[in-house]
Curated annotation (Swiss-Prot):
May catalyze the synthesis of indole-3-acetic acid (IAA)-amino acid conjugates, providing a mechanism for the plant to cope with the presence of excess auxin. Keywords: Ligase. The gene is GH3.9. The keyword Chloroplast does not apply. Belongs to the IAA-amido conjugating enzyme family. GO terms for cellular component: cytoplasm. The keyword Ligase applies. Induction: At low level by auxin. One of its GO terms (biological process) is response to auxin. It is an enzyme of class 6 (ligase). It comes from Oryza sativa subsp. japonica. GO terms for molecular function: acid-amino acid ligase activity. This is Probable indole-3-acetic acid-amido synthetase GH3.9. It holds the Pfam family GH3_M.
Length: 441
């Protein structure tokens, strides 16, 4: 849990991120007993000091932890990555019974001092577990009483499901609720369902909800209310809130999966935006995720490797333009763990083609029929690259607690960072399958 510094509007009003307002509220502070992280550590605006303090307190109270959670799945993956990088110093501080100079915030040091005690046995345990190089099931190995993982794993966060399953040893992954900065939307009434099947039941008392059918003209006459949505259809959600937003388009696309009594249930599909486009092709985040998942499950997982994080961009620096997909890999075995270049060129090329086979017919037509789209390229980046991307975003004002890995990057400095961390790359070695559809007329 992390906060971001607040700012003031020209009119003198306080402006802050939604999660920051939650963590600074009296209601949240009254629930401090439910967390291993002391409030001072959560409210520390220095990301490293906050993460370090929360991790050391979590280790000291490892037998008390029954829920391993964060708002977004990405934050949990970052926490384990932090442990991978800093376990030596964490163990040293636990053995000494006090924080080193790397945590300088007085309020954080005071809060942690009430929890941290010299414990040579725990320090040695952390060293033994983390030095193995095998991070499979690390959550249940260090926090043995953990019953489930709690985080949002829908939409862009779906890419972390496999990684969390690996780190947790197969614990249930629970995505409890659906909310945004604008309002609260709904809850998951089947919390232990498969992460890929999460649906949220809309809470009709949190806002006035209307829905714009996907593909229809953006017009008030096409909006439907909660009672008139149809199962199987996709809608863009439009809200009118108590705070004053009127028919505000949130940008989320939802699919109706059923009803609980009279309340509709929705599955988050994607953000209403196109990620990649070179010519006539239009690839959104859901389609890109399916393509990555198809290649990963078919060609990487049998080799004990998976995609930990990914992003993409449309490269038009050469003609024809092509898709570039950046992968950071996770090696799911002690041998070679932490090595970013764990897939041979032939396999990586097959991954490129497998992704292309999963993309739309329009994309494949551009590749096969007229050559207007070049071969898809996968670039493997070294471990820790996406952590650096996050650090760059945070340094520019993004809240670490609400940070999401962008599914498409266009900012030159981010592209430059990614390209500077590439350890191997490969293009699709062949054309994807495409057969022209006969015209009905």
């Amino acid at each position: 849990m992390f906060v971001k510094s607040e700012t003031k509007t020209r009119g003198g009003l306080t402006a802050w991120f939604a999660l920051t307002s939650v963590y600074k509220s009296e209601q949240f502070k009254s629930m401090a007993i439910a967390y291993t992280s002391p409030t001072a550590a959560i409210l520390c605006e220095d990301a490293f000091q906050s993460m370090y303090a929360q991790m050391v307190c979590g280790l000291c109270q490892r037998h008390d932890v029954v829920r391993f959670g964060a708002v977004f799945a990405a934050a949990l993956v970052r926490a384990i990555r932090f442990l991978q990088l800093n376990w030596g110093q964490l163990a040293a501080d636990i053995e000494a019974g006090e924080l080193g100079p790397h945590v300088a915030d007085p309020s954080v040091r005071e809060a942690v001092s009430g929890i941290l005690r010299s414990d040579a046995e725990l320090a040695e345990f952390v060293r033994i577990e983390c030095s193995k190089g095998d991070w499979a099931g690390i959550i249940t190995r260090i926090w043995p009483n953990t019953k489930y993982v709690d985080a949002i794993v829908t939409g862009a966060m779906a890419q972390y499901i496999r990684t969390l399953q690996y780190y947790s040893g197969g614990l249930p992954i629970v995505s409890t609720s659906y909310a945004s900065s604008e309002c609260f939307f709904g809850i998951n009434l089947r919390p232990v369902c498969d992460p890929s099947e999460v649906s949220y039941t809309i809470m009709p008392n949190t806002a006035y909800f209307e829905f714009l059918p996907v593909g229809e003209v953006v017009d008030a006459t096409n909006l439907v209310d909660l009672a008139r949505v149809e199962v199987g259809r996709e809608y863009e959600v439009v809200i009118t809130t108590y705070a004053g937003l009127s028919r505000y388009r949130v940008g989320d696309v939802l699919r109706v999966t059923g009803f609980h009594n009279a309340a509709p249930q929705f599955r988050f599909v994607r953000r209403q935006s196109v990620l990649l486009s070179v010519e006539l092709d239009k690839t959104d985040e859901a389609e890109l995720h399916r393509a990555v998942e198809r290649a990963s499950s078919a060609l990487l997982r049998p080799r004990g490797v998976s995609v930990a994080e990914y992003t993409s961009r449309a490269c038009t620096e050469r003609i024809p333009g092509h898709y570039v997909v950046y992968w950071e890999l996770l090696t799911e075995s002690p041998v070679g763990a932490g090595d970013g270049d764990t897939v041979d060129g032939e396999t990586l090329g097959r991954c490129c083609l497998e992704m292309e086979e999963a993309l739309s017919a329009v994309y494949r037509q551009g590749r096969v029929a007229d050559g207007s789209i070049g071969p898809l390229e996968i670039r493997i980046v070294r471990p820790g690259t996406f952590e650096e991307v996050m650090d760059l975003a945070v340094s520019r004002g993004t809240s670490i607690g609400q940070y999401k890995v962008p599914q498409c990057v266009t900012v030159p400095s981010v592209v430059e960072l990614l390209d500077s961390r590439v350890v191997s790359s490969q293009f699709s070695p062949a054309l994807p399958h495409w057969i022209p559809t006969p015209r009905s007329d």
